[in-house]
Amino acid sequence: MTEAQTACATTETPVAAPAAPRWRVADVIALYELPFNDLLFRAQQTHREHFDANAIQLSTLLSIKTGGCEEDCGYCSQSAHHDTGLKAEKLMEVDAVLAAARTAKENGATRFCMGAAWRNPKDRHIEPIKEMIRGVKDMGLETCVTLGMLEEHQAKALAEAGLDYYNHNLDTSPEFYGQIISTRTYQDRLDTLERVRDAGINVCCGGIIGMGESRRERAGLIAQLANMNPYPESVPINNLVAIEGTPLENAQALDPFEFVRTIAVARITMPKAMVRLSAGREQLDDAMQALCFLAGANSMFYGDVLLTTGNPRAEADRKLLARLGMWASEASQLSA
């Protein structure tokens, strides 16, 4: 090597090492293990830095295509692999979906989510779903859809329709994932989320707890979410609803305090995200739901049916917020 080559070699810019994760699993476990009052105090402090602590966004979720899904998710009543007595239905007509959205708005919801039980949508499905998105947005509602895995061109088409959020949950930690589903890999989920992000759509991504996972595995889910760059704008936390006919029908109920802890840890690790109380909320009494709000939850799914599981009645939800001195708010009004 010549002197010039040697000089050139020694002055080359070294390749940067990959950035360290913002949250190690051990750090998330340490949050979980804080005394309950200390954890909630820290979560509430974080929450108040970014949001109006007494404002809750009300969301409604409609199943626009029910049952017959090719996936084998162990928790899901809509899987064709499980005998849950759920009849598979075709994609709803656009007018029927828009009628449901109008009802949701009349009942106080400001966010309307549409879910389809597919492994992935066919291209022929995208156009009617774009019509639904446009129609719901014309009502002044925030839009979210969950349709399974997406190809790049499908994500772009949804973005062109003005979709606000795309939901695609990780479900659980990478380590526990194989015990819940075998028909779709963890990387498949991450790839869809990347396509959604690249299309310019806000990411809605969370998981389900109470499926038999350990606290470490719950922490693994939160760390995975919090270390996304950027982390999701919307993080739904689901409490398993054990449905007869699914592999998890006999799952042991999660300690409600562990659910509250998970909400608090999600708030601390993803301070600017909307943390949403999702499926399984009916398993929490009013006092536990109030603790979830204290822990930093600032959205809840609202209405009588959440996909194919029950959800507290809308009137009961309104009364609960009134008793707590809290109020329903537009998404744009939630920030402090």
Swiss-Prot record:
Domain called Radical SAM core: residue spans: 54-281
Keyword entries, A-Z: 2Fe-2S, 4Fe-4S, Biotin biosynthesis, Iron, Iron-sulfur, Metal-binding, S-adenosyl-L-methionine, Transferase
Cofactor note: Binds 1 [4Fe-4S] cluster. The cluster is coordinated with 3 cysteines and an exchangeable S-adenosyl-L-methionine. Binds 1 [2Fe-2S] cluster. The cluster is coordinated with 3 cysteines and 1 arginine.
Coiled coil is among the record's keywords: no
Recorded family membership: Belongs to the radical SAM superfamily. Biotin synthase family.
Protein name: Biotin synthase
List of residues binding [4Fe-4S] cluster: C69, C73, C76
GO-annotated molecular function: 2 iron, 2 sulfur cluster binding; 4 iron, 4 sulfur cluster binding; biotin synthase activity; iron ion binding
Binding residues annotated for [2Fe-2S] cluster, in chain numbering: C113, C144, C204, R276
InterPro entries the record matches: Aldolase_TIM (IPR013785), BATS_dom (IPR010722), Biotin_synth/BioAB (IPR002684), Biotin_synthase (IPR024177), Elp3/MiaA/NifB-like_rSAM (IPR006638), rSAM (IPR007197)
Pfam annotation, one family: BATS
Domain of life per record: Bacteria
Alphabetized Gene3D superfamilies for the sequence: Aldolase class I (3.20.20.70)
E.C. no: 2.8.1.6
Cofactor(s) listed in the protein's UniProt record: [4Fe-4S] cluster; [2Fe-2S] cluster
